[in-house]
Amino acid sequence: MDFEEDYDAEFDDNQEGQLETPFPSVAGADDGDNDNDDSVAENMKKKQKREAVVDDGSENAFGIPEFTRKDKTLEEILEMMDSTPPIIPDAVIDYYLTKNGFNVADVRVKRLLALATQKFVSDIAKDAYEYSRIRSSVAVSNANNSQARARQLLQGQQQPGVQQISQQQHQQNEKTTASKVVLTVNDLSSAVAEYGLNIGRPDFYR
């Protein structure tokens, strides 16, 4: 009986010791799960940061220059005004803004207004050039018209001296127009008329 009691007591002590000792395999598995969770969280943070950077435009994954993006914020445009000023000088901008009662301390805002003015003038010049080309093509078609040439010959027979002078002037005009493009006030008035501006002569002067 004493042997059985000693064996039972030893068995109970061993069982309690096994219950108190931690399981190393389970603890290792928990550490692995924590490491996996940390790595997944880090990957998600890196992905979100990369997407935020690309959406912000501060960094480009494909190496495309910054100025190729068409959609820019006002802050980005103002930052570009520091390094890339417009064609209109700052002194001219200050003069006309002061003349019209517009006082701004920030130079970038002034340059932004100058850039808008530059774009407006460029569009008007392009439109005036197109009107000049249309006018030149109409003049060439009238010169190639047989009826117009017959009318000029008839006038030359009636007034030979005037016809000779007009032919010389016409040849000189052809030489000059072939070498350069002439923009007239009529071309400019037709171009700015699309923007609601009337710079033509009033009707009572005609």
From Swiss-Prot:
Q: Name one GO biological process term.
A: positive regulation of transcription by RNA polymerase II
Sequence ranges assigned to domain Histone-fold in this UniProt record: 47-194
This molecule's function is given as: Functions as a component of both the DNA-binding general transcription initiation factor complex TFIID and the transcription coactivator SAGA complex. Binding of TFIID to a promoter (with or without TATA element) is the initial step in pre-initiation complex (PIC) formation.
* Record region (Disordered): 1-57
The molecule here is called SAGA complex/transcription factor TFIID complex subunit TAF10
PANTHER family registered for this protein in UniProt: TRANSCRIPTION INITIATION FACTOR TFIID SUBUNIT 10 (PTHR21242:SF0)
What domain of life does the UniProt record list for this protein's source? Eukaryota
GO MF: chromatin binding; identical protein binding; molecular adaptor activity; promoter-specific chromatin binding
Which family does the UniProt entry place this protein in?
Belongs to the TAF10 family.
Q: What is known of its domains?
A: The histone-fold domain (HFD) mediates heterodimerization with TFIID-specific components TAF47 and TAF65 as well as SAGA-specific component SPT7.
What are the UniProt keywords, alphabetically?
Nucleus, Phosphoprotein, Transcription, Transcription regulation
Composition skew (Acidic residues), residue ranges: 1-15, 30-40
Cellular component GO terms, alphabetical: nucleus; SAGA complex; SLIK (SAGA-like) complex; transcription factor TFIID complex
Q: List the disulfide bonds.
A: none
